Amino acid sequence: INLGFNSEIGFANTKARLRMITLYQVAASSNGLVVGTGNKVEDFGVGFFTKYGDGGVDISPIADLTKSEVKSIARELKISQKIIMAEPTDGLWDDNRNDEQQLGLSYEEIEKAMFDENSINRKKYLDIRKNNIHKMNAIPVCIINKKIKSN
């Protein structure tokens, strides 16, 4: 019986969730926290993370910083240029595709589109965001009618 469990995106998201489980085990073993690496552009601009995967963290110290702000701070901290300029990738795909290949826009293009309504990439940015907005919103709670609850 083929149940159709051959979704490429499903396998990639499973890898991200297994990473999260591993990070929480390490954190629990060391009485620590899982620290998020998502920034304002990636996580809250376009929602480019796996729900209950790399989005599952205890604290997000750079979530209010854009990608360009993170790079600027990294330069101030004298972080290696090789690290600052490294190609963004989630490492979840067998073909080693990078974030830009997955999103269809670079982070520079996304950042510009986020803040410039006249950006040539504004529509594409908004489309990506619309598809992922469910990850950025609180989980919907079903309110049960009191009459039903009391039965």
Please name every model-derived segment.
Residues 1-17, 21-24, 28-33, 37-41, ...:
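ATP/NTP-dependent adenylation/nucleotidyl-transfer catalytic domains that generate, transfer
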